[in-house]
């Protein structure tokens, strides 16, 4: 039986809260897992504190280090990422190194860095 993701999401969307609760319980029993949120591990001593802080970082900055040789492609990428106008994006690229995006999720930041690198720029995730 082929059950694709879209059909599954449609089925979930039509379920009531009670039905969803029963589904969660059935999944827990079937696979031996728990839907309870995991508690954050307690912070270690002073030596482990720095490593724990680095792992917990949730907001990232995308930094344009260098525009590279293909400035036009980089300006287009910056416009796509930021939604800036042409002049603002050009000024940002010309003023490198500069933050392109600040305080964004890791997945979004990685996607932005990838787009800038593909356009020929040198970009960093901080």
From Swiss-Prot:
Organism annotation: Acidovorax ebreus (strain TPSY) (Diaphorobacter sp. (strain TPSY))
Gene Ontology cellular component list: cytosolic large ribosomal subunit
GO-annotated molecular function: mRNA binding; structural constituent of ribosome
CDD domains (UniProt xref): Ribosomal_L7_L12 (cd00387)
InterPro entries reported in the protein's UniProt record: Ribosomal_bL12 (IPR000206), Ribosomal_bL12_C (IPR013823), Ribosomal_bL12_C/ClpS-like (IPR014719), Ribosomal_bL12_oligo (IPR008932), Ribosomal_bL12_oligo_N_sf (IPR036235)
Keywords associated with the record: Ribonucleoprotein, Ribosomal protein
A GO BP entry: translation
Function: Forms part of the ribosomal stalk which helps the ribosome interact with GTP-bound translation factors. Is thus essential for accurate translation.
Pfam families: Ribosomal_L12, Ribosomal_L12_N
Entry similarity comment: Belongs to the bacterial ribosomal protein bL12 family.
Name of the protein this chain belongs to: Large ribosomal subunit protein bL12
């Amino acid at each position: 039986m082929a059950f694709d993701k879209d059909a599954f999401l449609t089925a979930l969307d039509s379920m009531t809260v009670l039905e969803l609760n029963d589904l969660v319980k059935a999944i827990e029993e079937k696979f031996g897992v728990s839907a309870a949120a995991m508690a954050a591990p307690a912070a270690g001593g002073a030596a482990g504190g720095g490593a724990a802080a680095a792992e917990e970082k949730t907001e990232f900055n995308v930094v344009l280090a260098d525009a590279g040789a293909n400035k036009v492609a980089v300006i287009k990428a910056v416009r796509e990422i930021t939604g800036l106008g042409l002049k603002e994006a050009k000024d940002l690229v010309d003023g490198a190194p500069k933050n392109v995006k600040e305080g964004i999720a890791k997945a979004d930041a990685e996607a932005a860095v990838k787009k800038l690198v593909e356009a020929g720029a040198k970009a960093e995730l901080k």
